């Protein structure tokens, strides 16, 4: 619910204050579930109530000076959202990206990494991390990592 999201945001802000006092940053990494819609307690069970996307509630309910977001672009797409829309709407909130594809970067055809990187850099990206999961049969994790590295190393849009 919206009320639950508000509580989570309060906890995130408190954690961010504690982290800041210790000289470290506190951030959050999404999955696809954050792109579901939450509704107000009073609207639960009512027909036609659309609700708010949980991720938007989190971004709007947290202090950018205390909480950063590490967008997992794969799970954002799996949540039926466009990472570019989030970079535009919440510029500066994603200093870190979690780059992932269905398996090897650039091979699924479902992730437009060129547009993702270009817009992310334009809106404040500092660094990114790659996760490789769902490695196909017959390939070692090291071979998969090498293919991901090669893809990014050759990509003219990666700084």
Regions found by a protein language model. Give the residues of each.
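Active-site acidic/histidine proton-transfer and metal-coordination neighborhood
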Residues: 1-68, 142
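Histidine-acidic metal/acid-base catalytic patches
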Residues: 38-39, 43, 52-71, 75-159
């Amino acid at each position: 619910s919206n009320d639950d999201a508000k509580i989570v945001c309060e906890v995130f802000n408190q954690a961010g204050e504690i982290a800041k006092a210790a000289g470290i940053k506190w951030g959050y990494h999404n999955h696809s579930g954050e792109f579901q819609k939450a509704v107000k307690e009073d609207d639960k069970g009512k027909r036609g109530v659309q609700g708010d996307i949980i991720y938007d509630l989190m971004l709007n309910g947290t202090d950018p000076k205390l909480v950063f977001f590490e967008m997992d672009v794969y799970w954002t797409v799996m949540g039926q959202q466009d990472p570019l829309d989030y970079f535009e709407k919440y510029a500066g909130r994603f200093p870190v990206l979690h780059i992932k594809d269905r398996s090897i970067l650039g091979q699924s055809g479902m992730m437009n990494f060129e547009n993702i990187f270009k817009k992310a850099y334009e809106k404040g990206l500092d660094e990114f991390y790659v996760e490789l999961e769902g490695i196909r049969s017959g390939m070692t994790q090291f071979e998969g990592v090498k293919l991901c590295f090669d893809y990014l190393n050759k990509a003219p849009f990666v700084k």
